[in-house]
């Protein structure tokens, strides 16, 4: 669990951040793997592809679609208690590297908090900088799901 002292800034959650966190839970449990892939931040996509290449090197039967599906299944297992949509925090927490965390509270007898990582990605559209929020499933030690 992430502690508040690990964050550089805590602010009120914006509508865009709230929607990104809710959308992540919704997309995570859909069957469409391409939709899951499309919400991941570029850093995580690169990490996944690098891990895939290393695994494929040692086992040529490993294929990318199945590899990504296995990762999604592992992430689904972590967030499974949120399928019925938990309550979303009113705050967003920023790391010193710019990654954001939105907390979702699970339901049940012993509810726990599930952090959803958001990464701002900047791109140029019609000669103007724009930003979109993408999901980050890895923590700073990129080998572990962000819990």
Which functions belong to the PLM regions below?
Residues 6, 10, 14, 29, ...:
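Intrinsic-disorder-associated interaction segments
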Residues 102-147:
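Short beta-strand edge/turn micro-motifs at domain boundaries
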Residues 18-21, 33, 45, 64, ...:
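Short amphipathic alpha-helical segments that mediate assembly, nucleic-acid/protein binding
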Residues 1-30, 46:
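Short, low-complexity N-terminal intrinsically disordered segments enriched in polar/charged residues
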Residues 53-115:
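Surface-exposed, charged secondary-structure patches
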Residues 32-50, 54:
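Short, well-ordered alpha-helical segments enriched in acidic and aromatic residues
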């Amino acid at each position: 669990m992430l502690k508040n002292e690990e964050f550089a800034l805590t602010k009120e959650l914006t509508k865009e951040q709230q929607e990104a966190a809710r959308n992540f839970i919704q997309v995570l449990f859909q069957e469409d793997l391409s939709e899951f892939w499309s919400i991941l931040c570029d850093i995580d996509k690169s990490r996944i592809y690098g891990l895939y290449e290393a695994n494929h090197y040692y086992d040529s039967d490993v294929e990318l679609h199945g590899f990504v599906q296995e990762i999604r299944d592992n992430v689904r297992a972590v967030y499974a208690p949120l399928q019925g949509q938990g309550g979303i925090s009113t705050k967003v927490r920023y790391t010193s590297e710019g990654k954001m965390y939105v907390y979702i509270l699970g339901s049940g007898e012993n509810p726990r908090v599930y952090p959803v990582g958001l990464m701002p990605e900047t791109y140029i559209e019609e000669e103007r900088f724009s930003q979109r929020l993408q999901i980050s499933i890895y923590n700073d030690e990129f080998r572990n799901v962000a819990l």
